[in-house]
């Protein structure tokens, strides 16, 4: 987990911060996170943002996903388990598999390295910490593996 954690900041850009972060069909108030960079979010923010991933626009989902990875890796390294981020991780993983099933192109916008980081994060989390049932967890890891393979073929 620590290797991915250290590379995290390099793999995902901090700027630009997206302006339109809410899906147009959603009405929840997510001003708490508006204008904040993903790197500025900490474990204590989890109680305020755990349900935001379901209302995020695709752009905001891609932008803020590294925050969840960063926060959860920090906890796994420090406590050997998820602490404050457990519900945030569950909701994010549930939302991630839903978005994959709806539109895989959302994930094609991630780079090869970013996709590898997301997959490593899921594998390090393990099925029990992801909040996903075994089928959804395997499907999520498989989709990420296929997208990584697709990116590596494009690079040839």
Q: Can you annotate each of these PLM segments?
A:
Residues 62-156:
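Extended alpha-helical scaffolding segments
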Residues 13-16, 20, 80, 150-151:
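Short, flexible coil/linker elements and helix-boundary hinge sites characteristic
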């Amino acid at each position: 987990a620590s290797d991915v954690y250290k590379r995290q900041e390099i793999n995902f850009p901090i700027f630009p911060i997206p302006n339109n972060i809410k899906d147009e069909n959603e009405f929840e108030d997510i001003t708490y996170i508006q204008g904040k960079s993903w790197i500025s979010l900490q474990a204590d923010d989890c109680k305020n943002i755990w349900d935001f991933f379901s209302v995020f626009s695709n752009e905001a989902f891609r932008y803020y996903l590294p925050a969840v990875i960063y926060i959860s890796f920090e906890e796994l390294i420090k406590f050997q388990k998820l602490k404050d981020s457990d519900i945030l991780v569950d909701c994010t993983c549930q939302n991630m598999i839903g978005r994959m099933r709806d539109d895989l192109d959302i994930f094609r916008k991630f780079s090869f390295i970013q996709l590898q980081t997301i997959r490593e994060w899921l594998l390090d989390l393990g099925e029990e910490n992801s909040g996903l049932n075994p089928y959804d967890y395997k499907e999520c890891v498989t989709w990420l593996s296929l997208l990584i393979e697709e990116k590596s073929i494009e690079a040839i």
